[in-house]
């Protein structure tokens, strides 16, 4: 009964998340398709990691143009927490990672998140240790103010890194007084 109520309440959101998956055209046998590529990359990152990662949440920032001041004055923007993961670099130099992280959210309540991240990586300098990345993360989170119901997430990723240290970030889109949050963390590879 409770699950049915949630599905009815969030039908539009669920439909918008599922519709793009249904609209993907079929692919030829020679091309394994985006979904098989995705699942192969997740599996390879799970089975053959090159690194183990420590995630340290650094900042959340609520876009001031999208919030009432009295709300932002109450929100936590120091997301204390920690996370762990494993990652690898593919033959094109792109980053793949699996991670679990828990941090204090805007209401200073614990929020877990876990998933897969991918970034196309550029090394614009002669020093290959310096890199920039753009990509996405697909995962699941849960929040206190939503009764810790698992919520799927598909968010953009961007990063700047040098050697084993990377400053990685995302933006959670939203409406007025909801979402519109910049979230960033440090990732250290071991």
From Swiss-Prot:
It comes from the Bacteria. Residues 1-29 form the signal peptide. Its main location: membrane. GO terms for molecular function: acyltransferase activity. Its EC number is 2.3.1.251. InterPro entries: LipidA_acyl_PagP, OMP/PagP_b-brl. It is found in: Cell outer membrane. It catalyses: a lipid A + a 1,2-diacyl-sn-glycero-3-phosphocholine = a hepta-acyl lipid A + a 2-acyl-sn-glycero-3-phosphocholine; a lipid IVA + a 1,2-diacyl-sn-glycero-3-phosphocholine = a lipid IVB + a 2-acyl-sn-glycero-3-phosphocholine; a lipid IIA + a 1,2-diacyl-sn-glycero-3-phosphocholine = a lipid IIB + a 2-acyl-sn-glycero-3-phosphocholine. GO terms for cellular component: cell outer membrane. The record marks 176 as: Role in the phospholipid gating. The active site is at residues 62, 105-106. Keywords: Acyltransferase, Cell outer membrane, Membrane, Signal, Transferase. Belongs to the lipid A palmitoyltransferase family. Transfers a fatty acid residue from the sn-1 position of a phospholipid to the N-linked hydroxyfatty acid chain on the proximal unit of lipid A or its precursors. Homodimer. This is Lipid A acyltransferase PagP. It comes from Salmonella typhi.
